[in-house]
């Protein structure tokens, strides 16, 4: 983090080691395996997409602990409709907290966007058919994407996706 008054930066999370991040581990002294994207909820909790870790974590800032939300750590594309922690992700690079009670992730190498339901602990694909490509516009689950990286959810719940190799910003409107 950066102290905006002094301009001094310091490491806030991670040890510099490429190791798995254990569920429930303290924030200090724990490895963070390939953080690629960060978002925050209104309570001040951070959400991390870990590319090399093929996982998603909540950083519980009040308790000072990592909470494992999704991904087994193994590369793959599995688990849709089931428990998010048992799902396989492949290089997640984007993350967005949403006011609808979910967290959206760009599951980059699977060419999809998936939603974690924070109350149920489940995961579903919401955009993309899993094949690399470009479009067509229309039904979100039939759309091909090419390595989506960024995701953003606005106050109204509209989802925006940076579809990197298709050179487009896609939108799913509520």
Listing of model-derived features with the role each one plays in the protein:
Residues 6-34, 63-91, 120-147:
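Gly/Pro-rich loop segments of beta-rich domains
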Residues 40-43, 97-100, 153-156:
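Residue-level detector of Asp-centered blade-edge/turn motifs that repeat once per structural unit
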Residues 147-174:
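Blade-level signature of beta-propeller repeat domains, shared across WD40, Kelch, NHL, RCC1
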């Amino acid at each position: 983090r950066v102290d905006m008054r002094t301009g001094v930066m310091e490491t806030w999370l991670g040890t510099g080691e490429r190791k798995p991040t254990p569920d429930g581990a303290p924030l200090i002294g724990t490895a963070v395996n390939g953080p690629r994207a960060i978002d925050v909820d209104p309570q001040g909790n951070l959400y991390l997409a870990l590319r090399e870790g093929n996982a998603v974590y909540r950083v519980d800032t009040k308790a000072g602990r990592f909470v494992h939300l999704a991904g087994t750590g193994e590369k793959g594309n599995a688990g849709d409709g089931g428990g998010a922690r048992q799902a396989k992700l492949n290089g997640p690079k984007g993350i967005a907290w949403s006011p609808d009670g979910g967290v959206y992730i760009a599951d980059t190498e699977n060419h999809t966007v998936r939603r974690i339901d924070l109350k149920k602990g489940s995961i579903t694909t919401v955009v993309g058919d899993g094949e690399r490509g470009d479009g067509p516009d229309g039904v979100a689950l039939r759309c091909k994407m090419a390595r989506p990286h960024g995701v953003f959810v606005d106050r109204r719940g509209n989802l925006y996706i940076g579809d990197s190799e298709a050179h487009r910003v896609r939108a799913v409107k509520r």
